[in-house]
Amino acid sequence: MSSFQGQMAEYPTISIDRFDRENLKARAYFLSHCHKDHMKGLRAPSLKRRLECSLKVFLYCSPVTKELLLTSPKYRFWENRIITIEIETPTQISLVDEASGEKEEVVVTLLPAGHCPGSVMFLFQGSNGTVLYTGDFRLAKGEASRMELLHSGGRVKDIQSVYLDTTFCDPRFYQIPSREQCLRGILELVRSWVTRSPHHVVWLNCKAAYGYEYLFTNLSEELGVQVHVDKLDMFKNMPDILHHLTTDRNTQIHACRHPKAEECFQWNKLPCGITSQNKTALHTISIKPSTMWFGERTRKTNVIVRTGESSYRACFSFHSSFSEIKDFLSYICPVNVYPNVIPVGLTVDKVMDVLKPLCRSPQSVEPKYKPLGKLKRARTIHLDSEEDDDLFDDPLPTPLRHKVPYQLTLQPELFSMKALPLDQPELRQSPGGCKAESVWSPSLANFIDCEESNSDSGEELETPPPSLQGGLGPSTLVQQNADPDVDIPQWEVFFKRRDEITGECLEHLPSSIETGGSQSPKLCSDSPKLCSDSPKLCSDSDGDSTHISSQNSSQSTHITDQGSQGWDSQCDTVLLSSQEKSGGDSTSLNKGAYKPKLKESISASQIEQDALCPQDTHCDLKSRAEVNGAPCLVELDTLSGRKSPPEKTLLSSTRADSQSSSDFEIPSTPEAELPTPEHLQCLYRKLATGQSIVVEKRKCSLLDS
């Protein structure tokens, strides 16, 4: 029994299968089929008056429903107000408010419902979305997928709401035999009975005026016997049905009905009261198609069940089973669902608990039509109001510039890449020569920006000539002991380093150090003091300064390493002081006599200071005139062993050349002469006895040996 009130939330100006109360104000009426529970108020006087006062109110239904409706004289007043719509034919109708003239366009499509002759479902498409009203329906599993008008673009239409027939939305009716199964069971029973003799008859006890036409026509076609009914006028325009029915009582299959429920002839079970012509008693059985009775059974039964001596029950349903309802709704997958019928013993809430999980979420934003496939979208991030500070904690969207650490560590080992703990304040020394190991220790505190990029294709490292390698001996040759599997360090390792030279390295210091590429040649200070407040250690304007030249590569020790063949540049590791020191003498060092011992271990606090040498440093160096002839000399301030505090270490800001261009090279001093060993004997003696060599008191230090 339908409990639908007639109006849909999406289109309230339309009334379906209900024609009383609020539905009297509707702009259009729709009738799904001609069963009485769907025709309330259809012939009421109030509706008749509404039709008399309106010229644009019509009733829309299928052609079969119109024929069945107009067979009754009670509904003849609708004859000029009924508009038929063909099945599966989308039709646009106008909903007009006669008082205001407002008009609304809606497209209506009728779909077969399988409930009874002429029964349809209504699919409405308009400005308020797509809505499906099923009325009473019986659709087998998978039948909805074969309805083309429920689909668009190869997928189910986006249906907002479904007003669903839930007559058997109860687990008790989980599985109902199909009509074909029921037909086969009834057919076998009827055939076995009527073939016994002409006096064996069957009465089909059908409660509805029509709806069992499917059963009648198939029995008549299979057995060749027409079915007796009370009236044929309702089927006069349905020749396919009319051919299998008759009003002649002299037939073996009857579907006639009693004039009243209580009237039944005591001596005859047939409502029509037919008897045999030769006074022979008729042998009659009754078959009652029903569904509710089978739903009340606790055990599985057959399609046909004998309930008495001559009575049978047949499972035959006009409505979809519980499993068929779920299959249909899960396939349509609407946003909302509304039950049209409340099953016996259930409530609306219990029915909704079953139906709601089969619907899709209204918050779903997935596009229904994706002809180009799934496209990429920007990710949506919902920020919590309590975590607003996270907006400023994220990394910048622009790429960061390269960072070069201030502090690098060089150990007196052969040049090979090796990890060095940061907590070692001093480096080991080699008695046979100054062996240096390049170690990259990234600073965790201070970095400087690398303002230039270095192209790998723009420069190549030079290799020392064979003659030079043979002359230096094993103590001076570069050892290629780097592990080739170790990751090649970045070229930033050799930029902006602070180099310290201990006193005993002066014994093995060469006259010049060859740079592997065109590095920064400006290692001399513009200030008269080496440890001035200015962080610069180089100047092109200092004409008296001694330079490290890459032009005299034959007189310098080439530093190379197998593991660093891909390095873009190398950095000079000797710091030079200015010749312009007040009261100090400069002494040139002989070529090839000494090798530098390099040390660099600068903490973050030391970087902030401009101190390179201890305050009590003394030095006896030769005068400036004695060193003018050297082609490529290294001028150093030899320092005492007292260490200055870490806070007073010079901030080395020597800028390394990353472009390998000859424009940055500084030639050696013109007309310079190499110093002879006799000039340096005084210095050697002081170094051998451990005496302090004082040049000037400064706030810088190089560690003693």
From Swiss-Prot:
Role played: Required for V(D)J recombination, the process by which exons encoding the antigen-binding domains of immunoglobulins and T-cell receptor proteins are assembled from individual V, (D), and J gene segments. V(D)J recombination is initiated by the lymphoid specific RAG endonuclease complex, which generates site specific DNA double strand breaks (DSBs). These DSBs present two types of DNA end structures: hairpin sealed coding ends and phosphorylated blunt signal ends.
Record protein name field: Protein artemis
InterPro entries recorded: DRMBL, RibonucZ/Hydroxyglut_hydro
Composition bias, Low complexity: 546-559, 652-662
Family: Belongs to the DNA repair metallo-beta-lactamase (DRMBL) family.
GO molecular function terms listed in the Swiss-Prot or TrEMBL record: 5'-3' exonuclease activity; single-stranded DNA endodeoxyribonuclease activity
Main location: nucleus
Compositionally biased tracts (Acidic residues): 451-462
A GO term from the CC aspect: nonhomologous end joining complex
Enzyme class per UniProt: hydrolase
Pfam families, sorted: DRMBL
EC code(s) of this entry: 3.1.-.-
Chain segments carrying region Disordered: 451-484, 535-569, 638-675
Residues that bear Phosphoserine: 385, 658
Post-translational modification: Phosphorylation on undefined residues by PRKDC may stimulate endonucleolytic activity on 5' and 3' hairpins and overhangs. PRKDC must remain present, even after phosphorylation, for efficient hairpin opening. Also phosphorylated by ATM in response to ionizing radiation (IR) and by ATR in response to ultraviolet (UV) radiation.
Signal peptide (residue range): none
Subunit structure: Interacts with LIG4; the interaction is direct. Interacts with ATM. Interacts with BRCA1. Interacts with PRKDC. Interacts with TP53BP1. Also exhibits ATM- and phosphorylation-dependent interaction with the MRN complex, composed of MRE11, RAD50, and NBN.
Keyword annotations of the record: Adaptive immunity, DNA damage, DNA recombination, DNA repair, Endonuclease, Exonuclease, Hydrolase, Immunity, Magnesium, Nuclease, Nucleus, Phosphoprotein, SCID
Residues that bear Phosphothreonine: 380
Presence of keyword Aminoacyl-tRNA synthetase: no
Superkingdom to which the source organism belongs: Eukaryota
Encoding gene, per UniProt annotation: Dclre1c
Localization: Nucleus
BP GO annotations: adaptive immune response; B cell differentiation; chromosome organization; DNA recombination; double-strand break repair; response to ionizing radiation; telomere maintenance; V(D)J recombination
Keyword Nucleus found: yes
